[in-house]
Structure formats: structure tokens, C-alpha cells
Regions:
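N-terminal membrane-proximal hinge/A-helix region immediately C-terminal to the signal-anchor transmembrane segment
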Residues: 3-124, 149-150, 154, 182, ...
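Cytochrome P450 I-helix active-site segment
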Residues: 206-213, 344-400, 422-423, 448, ...
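Cytochrome P450 heme-thiolate monooxygenase catalytic core
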Residues: 99-106, 140-336
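Cytochrome P450 heme-binding "Cys pocket" and the immediately downstream C-terminal segment
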Residues: 196-197, 347-350, 460, 466-467, ...
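C-terminal helix/juxtamembrane-tail motif
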Residues: 2-4, 520-539
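Conserved cytochrome P450 K-helix/beta-meander segment immediately N-terminal to the heme-binding cysteine loop
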Residues: 429-461
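Short, small-residue alpha-helix embedded
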Residues: 331-344, 494
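Cytochrome P450 C-terminal beta-domain/meander region
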Residues: 67, 72, 374-392, 403-430
């Protein structure tokens, strides 16, 4: 045998090994090979799903794949998607951890509760603040009640009234901008207190600047989120796959939030909070998180948060605050946009909704004769039409319709009929598909609020149970949206305040179609409605 044949044989052996590892094994032998492929290339390459995400077509293409192949689909050599209740229960209530994908939600270089990878760390963070986002606290909080009263009666409704009375009312107002301003003022008031929160409703020029910074970064998350190692590699070579102005925008948003935190900290530590008799100025979330961290610090090195939250307490608080205000304003703003768009197409529905809202005591009719009050949360929750309109909007136009990835546990797990799925496989579900199960939601692309009106839809108990089980706008399990009760409460208050006093008409809805991705609003980021004041002469 010649010496030349040795490297040749070695090359052949390497080639055979490579073919086995990257083609034969993933395609024919791996436990994942038994799972249907979303695309012919998925067993050997992630290019299809990466390109799909880059083109912002993930939600629709994954939904089509599930319709064709069933509840478990393979998206890449090491990635799966699930779309049934059993899969949701396994993944989101079965100890599947988060992974690298969520690190993009870190702020100031430190994780927030949402971006933490491991459940133990997440649970420790969640215990600090979960009580103040509970339904009982949300419904009974004097601070939130007064914050809502000021935001609705002293900020939002005067703006809506002025646009309705304006000679240019026929031009309409961009309610997507208006609703986002409203929800931002709501969440920052609960975080920092009304005094130290935002006033985006009355500061139009700055809110437009802030929102422009916030939304301009969205199209540049693909590389750091889906290809973080490649992004870092090219960055070391001096090639930045993300424009530098995106970093500048992030820094400005972080600086703005840190300024809110510093003012709130001074308000508390300077003794001003204790002397302030206005409940609206109570920084509910900030104070609770600060107290939780101080309590956790007593555990010292034994705390699971010792290397993160306790090491950088101020930045950890700021990271949590920016996560809450970002998610808290945008998702609810999107929901209000689509809700108002839907009901603006049906004046009879608006009249029925208003009639129901006027049964509240106190109701939310504008009146110059007395100080306006906020109706009780319990009474709001007992309004079936209001609840139905909101639930159907959250179903069809979930603000976060995209995938919620997790990592399979080691050594292996089972998903549906597929066994021995190895650890470290990315797997997720998306509300876009869960909410479009035609067996649960007939004609799923149709907005039909009567799905949620049990006195009218004729559903059996089993149908109602399945309908509720498949509602996934806030995810599920121990890491579901912590702010779901807050969101439902503020949205019902905003709808009640507006539709007790006004009718809305569509002026311009070009670009109202929902984008594709993780958090998704209108493609145009706009919706123009005209408001018409309803004068109640009996009040």
C-alpha cells in the first residue's frame, strides 16, 4: 500500500462518517426521524426554518405544516413544533427549560425574569412579585384604581372628546398610537407610581419619538436571536450584522427606564413615598421587587439568585421594569387596536356593548356634575359581552402569536406518540396555530365573539371546556404571562371608558393585516378611527 493511499483512505473515512452523522443518522436513524418533516430538508439542515423566520413567515408556514402533518412536526435537525393540548401540557408544564433564544430579552447585560433560562431561578424571581399581579390584588388595589381613574378621565377621554369635537374629526385619529400610549401610562404607573411613570397620552411628541425607537429595532433581532454565535463571530471580525443605531436606540430606551427607576428609588428612600397621601403615586411593582431582593439578600451565597439578581440588584430591577413596560404596553396596545377595529365594523354590536356597559354602577359615562369613578372589577368581569369581545380578539389576533421555544430535558422525553426524543432539542408551540383548531373554533379565521357567549352559542359543556383549554393568548404553565390579570383588567377598563361614551368608525385601515413573528401588530403600525360622542340626555 502506497503512502499516498493513507490520507486518501482517511479522507474517505471522514467523508463516510460525515455522511452518516449529518445525513443518514438524522434522516433514518434518529428518534426525530419518525416525526413528519415540515420541509424535505429539515432532517439535514436548519436553513428552511431560518429562511422562513428571516422572511417573517414562520407562524403561517408552521400552521400549514401542522394542518398537513399533524400535532408534532420537525422544523430542523434539532427542532420541533407541537400543536395539541397534550403537547402543550408536556412542554409548558413538564419542566422544559428556556434557552439561548431568550437572551435577547436581557437588559443592561443582566437577565429579567422572562429571559432567565432555568426554572429555579425564574421561580425565585417570580415569588417576589407574583402576588401583586394576582387577580385579587389587581381587583382590590387602591393604587391601581386611582391610577386608572386619572389616566382614563384626566388624560384619555379628554383627548378622545377633543378629537370627536374637532372640525377635523373626519380625518380620524391614529388609535394604534393612542392605545399604546394609554397602555404605557397604565403599566408604568403600576410599576413606578403615577408621579414617576410616563405621561405619553399628554406628551405626544416624546411618545412618538419613544415608539419610533422601540419599533425600529424589531427587524434586526433575527441574527442575534436565531444565530447568536454567528453574530458574535462576525462581530469579532469587525462585521456587525446589526446596525450600530439599533444599539443606540436600545441604550436610549434603557436610559429612559433607568431614569424612571432612579426617580422612584429616590422617591422611596427619601421618605417622600411614605408622606404622599395620593394612592396613585404608589410604585407598587418597584417597591415589591425591591423588598423581595432585600429579603433574598439575607440568604447570601445560598440564594439561587446570588450570581445574577443579588450581584447586580439595581440593574436587575431596571431589567425587570423595562421588560414589564415593553411587554405590558405593546401587547395590550395591539389588542385594543384590533378590538376597536373589529367593533367599528358593527354599529349594532357597539350599541349592545354600550347598553351592557351602562348597567355598571357606577358606570363610566362622562359627567361634569361629579368626580368620575371607576366601576368595580368584579362588576366588569360579570359583563359577558365585554368579556366575549375581548376574548375573541385575543384568540384571533393574539398579540404574541409566535413560538414559545423550550428545550427538551435530558436524557429524553416523549411528545405524543413519539418516544425517546433526546435532550437539548428546541421545541415550541404558537398561539397562532393553537387558536385555529377548527374542531374547537369552527371557521377559525372568522372573528365571532359569540363563541364566548354561552347563552347564545349553544355549546355543550365539553365544547366550552375545549374552547377554554385551547385559549393560549397568555401561554400556560409556571412561566405563563405574569401580567395576564393586569392586561385583562386594563383592557376592560379602556373599552368601558371609550364605548360608554363614543361610537367609532373606520377612516383608514390600510395595513391592518397582522404581521408574522413573535409579537405582531398591524403591518402599517397604524389604524385611523373617527370618534362620535354619544350624548346621554338622561344623565
Amino acid at each position: 500500500m502506497s503512502l499516498l493511499s493513507i490520507p486518501i483512505l482517511a479522507s474517505i473515512a471522514i467523508l463516510i462518517a460525515a455522511i452518516y452523522k449529518f445525513i443518514v443518522y438524522p434522516t433514518l436513524i434518529s428518534p426525530l426521524s419518525k416525526i413528519p418533516n415540515a420541509h424535505w430538508s429539515t432532517p439535514i439542515s436548519p436553513i428552511w426554518i431560518l429562511w422562513t423566520r428571516y422572511q417573517c413567515q414562520e407562524n403561517r408556514k408552521l400552521h400549514a405544516a401542522h394542518l398537513k402533518h399533524g400535532p408534532v412536526v420537525r422544523l430542523a435537525p434539532n427542532e420541533l413544533s407541537v400543536n395539541d393540548i397534550g403537547g402543550l401540557r408536556t412542554v409548558y408544564a413538564g419542566g422544559f427549560e428556556k434557552g439561548q433564544w431568550y437572551s435577547i430579552f436581557d437588559n443592561y447585560g443582566v437577565p429579567c425574569m422572562f429571559s432567565t433560562w432555568h426554572s429555579r431561578t425564574h421561580s425565585a424571581r417570580k415569588r417576589m412579585i407574583s402576588n401583586i399581579y394576582s387577580k385579587s390584588i389587581i381587583h382590590s388595589s387602591p393604587a391601581l384604581a386611582e391610577q386608572a381613574r386619572v389616566i382614563l378621565y384626566e388624560r384619555l377621554l379628554p383627548i378622545v372628546t377633543s378629537t370627536a369635537d374637532s372640525a377635523r374629526s373626519s380625518d380620524g385619529v391614529d388609535v394604534h398610537d393612542l392605545w399604546n400610549a394609554t397602555t404605557m401610562d397604565f403599566i408604568t404607573a403600576y410599576l413606578f407610581g403615577l408621579k414617576n411613570g410616563s405621561n405619553f397620552l399628554q406628551n405626544e411628541s416624546y411618545r412618538r419619538h419613544w415608539f419610533q425607537l422601540y419599533h425600529s429595532r424589531k427587524t434586526y433581532t433575527f441574527f442575534p436571536q436565531e444565530l447568536p454565535r454567528s453574530s458574535q463571530f462576525f462581530k469579532r471580525l469587525g462585521i456587525n450584522l446589526t446596525p450600530t443605531w439599533v444599539d443606540d436606540a436600545n441604550q436610549e430606551l434603557e436610559a429612559w427606564t433607568k431614569d424612571r427607576c432612579d426617580h422612584t428609588s429616590g422617591f422611596i428612600n427619601g421618605g417622600f413615598a411614605a408622606k404622599d397621601s395620593d394612592p396613585a403615586n404608589e410604585p407598587v411593582v418597584f417597591t415589591t421587587l425591591l423588598s423581595g431582593i432585600e429579603k433574598e439578600q439575607k440568604k447570601g451565597s445560598e440564594s439561587v439568585l446570588n450570581d445574577t439578581t443579588l450581584r447586580f440588584p439595581e440593574l436587575s430591577i431596571a431589567s425587570e421594569m423595562i421588560d414589564h413596560l415593553a411587554a405590558g404596553h405593546e401587547t395590550s396596545g395591539i389588542t385594543m387596536t384590533y378590538l376597536s377595529w373589529q367593533v367599528s365594523q358593527d354599529l349594532a354590536l357597539q350599541d349592545d356593548l354600550r347598553a351592557e356597559l351602562l348597567t355598571l354602577s357606577p358606570n363610566m359615562l362622562l359627567s361634569a356634575s361629579s368626580k368620575q369613578s371607576i366601576p368595580s372589577s368584579k362588576d366588569l368581569d360579570n359583563l359577558p359581552l365585554l368579556h366575549a369581545v375581548l376574548m375573541e380578539t385575543l384568540r384571533l389576533r393574539a398579540a404574541i402569536p409566535g413560538g414559545q421555544p423550550r428545550m427538551t430535558p435530558y436524557p429524553s422525553c416523549t411528545l405524543g406518540k413519539f418516544t425517546e426524543i433526546p435532550g437539548g432539542v428546541r421545541v415550541g408551540a404558537q398561539a397562532h396555530s393553537v387558536h385555529r383548531n377548527a374542531q374547537v373554533y369552527p371557521d377559525p379565521e372568522k372573528w365571532d365573539h359569540k363563541r364566548w357567549l354561552d347563552t347564545e352559542n349553544g355549546y355543550s359543556e365539553e365544547q366550552r371546556r375545549e374552547r377554554d383549554r385551547h385559549f393560549w393568548a397568555f401561554s400556560s404553565g409556571g412561566r405563563m404571562c405574569i401580567g395576564s390579570n393586569f392586561a385583562m383588567h386594563e383592557l376592560k377598563l379602556i373599552v368601558a371608558a371609550v364605548y360608554s361614551n363614543f361610537r367609532t368608525y373606520i377612516v383608514k385601515d390600510e395595513g391592518i393585516e397582522q404581521t408574522d413573528g413573535y409579537t405582531c401588530g398591524p403591518a402599517s403600525n397604524k389604524l385611523f378611527l373617527r370618534f362620535e360622542r354619544i350624548i346621554d340626555h338622561s344623565s
